Structures are given as structure tokens and as C-alpha cells.
């Protein structure tokens, strides 16, 4: 059975020649607000003070003056085969194709890459392991720096994490930015968030909040990201280039590490967001209106076999592919992340299902780090390693605790997973935790 069956609403929109066309079930007319922003209590773009707390994201790049003529907001970086994807935006317009100059000397950036929308030309050639690279987004003059990781086989450890690893954006609320992996050793342990996004963290982070923000408020997100189609594009992940699917799951190699990001909401047995095939019983070929919920989604990849068996899903096989026979020698450090569902009321039921789906595979692959979940109070589920032992959950899933369990990457540096804390009370999302 294909994940593009007629009952599936909204499959991955970044389709390629190898991916089937999206199929939409239009039997039941949409009756929601004119602007489908994911909040039926407050259906306005600017917010009417009801419903979800509005999310806030100040510019990642602070303007040099109070009245800037131009400013580029660097939002995210992700590495893809033979290049890098850099997402940045400006409210003033560039007047030319987006471009990046890069090199070792900030005063002489000889290399140049240009592109449109989600791609840049290959700018990976000529880079050497361990060398600090400088880059500048054209039209605003901001210099940034990063250090390349060590090449495979080199024994010296990484002294700094060279990039942020933004993972897939959650489905159930399009404003979710995903998780970010950042260095947290020494003084940077308290200032790491300023390296990426100035957001309203709790008082533990030594960063002054922007005017009008309150602790634990979260981020404010641009209006254009308040629907499914929009969120597929501003936060594009390299699914097609790496054998994955859109923003939902992908993998890549960088330096000594192999990264895998998968979808923690759909595309495995007993996932918290049911796919439509699970409501089709007996002689039915499509779900009835009573069986169709706004939280149903997927599957987004192919399913060869029963939807109740995780190994039937394409996503499981992508994770399995990372455990090839040559992988331990090629990439001795494996890092895998899975964001959980945005709203999950039955926390431990979700843990059980995701462990049943992936635990055996991940342990057999001997991953150095497996991160499962956010720092948000609903699902602090960082485990070392992912295991059915209840001891690993102690202290990491307390609703009253703000601390997170650090993950160690020997001989590299200590890492934390950081995300804004959410406060959600919404009746339409209670079906996430329904019993299978």
C-alpha cells in the first residue's frame, strides 16, 4: 500500500520525480477559519488575545543601526551532499539573487555561491578539515565564522561545534521550529541560545529578553509560516537529496558523524498521529467523515505491508540504511534526533510506542547519541541510550523540572538540546493521546 492512497491528506509537498504526486481527499469541505493558522480559537493572523500564546522570533542578526537600510536574518544552516543550505531573509529585499561569499580570510572572501529560494551552488570544494571558514551574506556585510569538523580517521577531537542542526518541523503545529543542537561547554553553556535565535527562554539562560517578551513565552513566527504549504519551504530540510522525504526525515554525513533526523509524529506503528489507513476497516476503502480528524496525517512515505508494523514504513528503512556494514569505520559517531508530537498528553504511552518502533534498531546500530524529544515540559525524554529501562526516564520527564539531561559525545564536547518552552491548552488536540 502506498502512502499516497486516496485517503491521505497532505503528503510531502517537496515532491521530486521519484516521489508520487500529493493526493487530497476532498469529500468533506473545509469549515474552519479563512486563514488556517492552526488555532481555531484565534483564527486571526495578528492574534486576538485568545487561543494559543503567540510565538515570537526576533531577528537572529541584530541590525547595526536603529534604522537599517538593509538587514539579513540568518535563520538556519543545514549540510547536504556537496554543499550547504543557508536560509536567510530580509524585510527590505536584496535586489539580486541571494548569495554568500566565503573563505578563510574575512577581508578576502574569494569563494562565491549564489542561488534562489532553497538552494545555493556547491561551495564545498576547497574546504579542509579543522579550518575556520568565514562567510558573508551579500548585501548586508555581516561576517560569520565556523570551523570544519575533522576528516574521517583523524584522532583529534572537535573543539567546537561548527553548525546548528535544525531538525524537521513538527506537523501538528506549523510554527514549531524543531530542535537545535548547540555547544554548551564552558561559558557558552549559559549563552548558547544567542548563537542562533534570541528567544524567550526561562530565567536560567543569561540573555536579556527582547522588549515585550516574557519568560517561557516562546517565539513569534512570521505569518507566512502559518500553514502546511508555507512551513514546507522556509525550513526546508534536505530530504530529496539524501533519500528522505521532504522535511520529514533525512540523513547526511558530516566529518566523523552520521546524522539522522526522523519524523516522531507519523510513519511508524502506533504513531501518536494516526494515518488515515488506520481508520479504514472491513470493506471500507476511505475513512468516513466521523473517522476523519484534523490531527490525522500521513503516512508520508511508502508503506509496504501492514500499517501496524513499523518495518513496513519507508522511514524505518532510512534509519536502517545508516547501519550499513561500512558505517562504523566511515562514521564512528552517529547522531539521531526525533522530535516528538507537538502536543502529547499521554506522555508515557508515546514513549512506549516510539521505543517499540525504534529501540532495537538503534541499539543494534550502536549510536553515540540518540536524542528523543524537546526540552519542553511535555516531553523531556532525552535518553542515554534509548531503552525500556525506567531508570533512564528518571529526572528527565518531570513537568516541574526545567533542567535537561546532557548527552556526551566522547571525545567531543557536551551538548544540550534547546527549544522554547510551550504552554498549550487546546481541546482539538486531545486526540493525540488516544488509545490504539
Curated annotation (Swiss-Prot):
Glycans are attached at residues 227, 283, 304. Residues 1-20 form the signal peptide. InterPro entries: Acid_Pase_Asper, Metallo-depent_PP-like, Purple_acid_Pase-like_N. Its EC number is 3.1.3.2. Monomer. GO terms for molecular function: acid phosphatase activity; metal ion binding. It comes from the Eukaryota. It catalyses: a phosphate monoester + H2O = an alcohol + phosphate. This is Phosphate-repressible acid phosphatase. Keywords: Glycoprotein, Hydrolase, Signal. SUPFAM superfamilies: Metallo-dependent phosphatases (SSF56300), Purple acid phosphatase, N-terminal domain (SSF49363). Gene3D superfamilies: 3.60.21.10.
Amino acid at each position: 500500500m502506498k502512502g499516497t492512497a486516496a485517503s491521505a491528506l497532505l503528503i510531502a509537498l517537496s515532491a521530486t520525480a521519484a516521489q508520487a504526486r500529493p493526493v487530497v481527499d476532498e469529500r468533506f469541505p473545509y469549515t474552519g477559519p479563512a486563514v488556517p493558522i492552526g488555532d481555531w480559537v484565534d483564527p486571526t493572523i495578528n492574534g486576538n488575545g485568545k487561543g494559543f500564546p503567540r510565538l515570537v522570533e526576533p531577528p537572529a542578526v541584530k541590525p547595526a543601526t536603529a534604522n537599517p537600510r538593509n538587514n539579513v536574518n540568518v535563520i538556519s544552516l543545514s549540510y547536504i551532499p556537496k554543499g550547504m543550505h543557508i536560509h536567510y531573509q530580509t524585510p527590505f529585499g536584496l535586489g539580486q539573487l541571494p548569495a554568500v561569499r566565503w573563505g578563510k580570510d574575512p577581508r578576502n572572501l574569494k569563494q562565491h555561491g549564489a542561488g534562489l529560494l532553497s538552494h545555493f551552488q556547491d561551495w564545498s570544494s576547497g574546504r579542509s578539515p579543522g579550518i575556520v571558514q568565514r562567510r558573508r551574506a551579500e548585501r548586508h556585510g555581516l561576517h560569520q565564522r565556523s570551523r570544519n569538523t575533522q576528516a574521517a580517521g583523524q584522532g583529534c577531537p572537535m573543539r567546537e561545534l561548527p553548525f546548528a542542526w535544525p531538525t524537521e518541523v513538527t506537523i501538528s503545529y506549523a510554527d514549531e521550529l524543531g530542535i537545535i543542537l548547540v555547544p554548551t561547554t564552558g561559558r557558552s553553556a549559559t549563552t548558547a541560545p544567542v548563537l542562533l535565535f534570541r528567544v524567550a527562554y526561562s530565567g536560567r539562560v543569561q540573555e536579556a529578553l527582547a522588549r515585550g517578551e516574557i519568560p517561557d513565552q516562546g517565539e513569534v513566527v512570521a505569518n507566512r509560516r502559518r500553514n502546511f504549504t508555507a512551513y514546507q519551504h522556509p525550513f526546508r530540510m534536505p530530504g530529496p537529496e539524501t533519500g528522505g522525504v521532504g522535511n520529514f526525515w533525512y540523513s547526511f554525513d558530516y566529518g566523523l558523524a552520521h546524522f539522522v533526523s526522523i519524523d516522531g509524529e507519523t510513519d511508524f506503528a502506533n504513531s501518536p498521529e494516526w494515518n488515515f489507513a488506520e481508520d479504514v476497516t472491513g470493506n471500507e476503502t476511505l475513512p468516513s467523515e466521523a473517522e476523519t480528524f484534523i490531527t490525522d496525517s500521513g503516512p508520508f512515505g511508502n508503506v509496504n505491508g501492514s500499517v501496524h508494523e513499523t518495518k513496513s514504513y519507508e522511514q524505518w528503512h532510512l534509519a536502517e540504511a545508516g547501519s550499513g556494514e561500512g558505517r562504523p569505520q566511515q562514521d564512528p559517531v552517529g547522531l539521531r534526533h526525533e522530535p516528538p508530537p507537538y502536543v502529547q498528553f499521554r506522555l508515557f504511552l508515546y514513549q512506549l510506542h516510539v521505543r517499540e518502533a525504534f529501540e532495537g534498531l538503534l541499539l543494534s546500530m550502536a549510536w553515540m547519541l540518540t536524542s528523543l524529544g524537546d526540552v519542553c515540559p511535555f516531553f523531556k525524554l532525552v535518553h542515554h541510550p534509548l531503552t525500556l529501562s525506567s531508570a533512564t526516564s528518571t529526572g528527565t520527564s518531570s513537568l516541574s523540572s526545567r533542567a535537561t539531561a546532557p548527552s556526551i559525545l566522547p571525545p567531543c564536547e557536551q551538548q544540550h538540546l534547546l527549544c522554547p518552552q510551550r504552554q498549550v491548552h487546546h481541546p482539538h488536540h486531545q486526540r493525540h493521546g488516544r488509545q490504539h
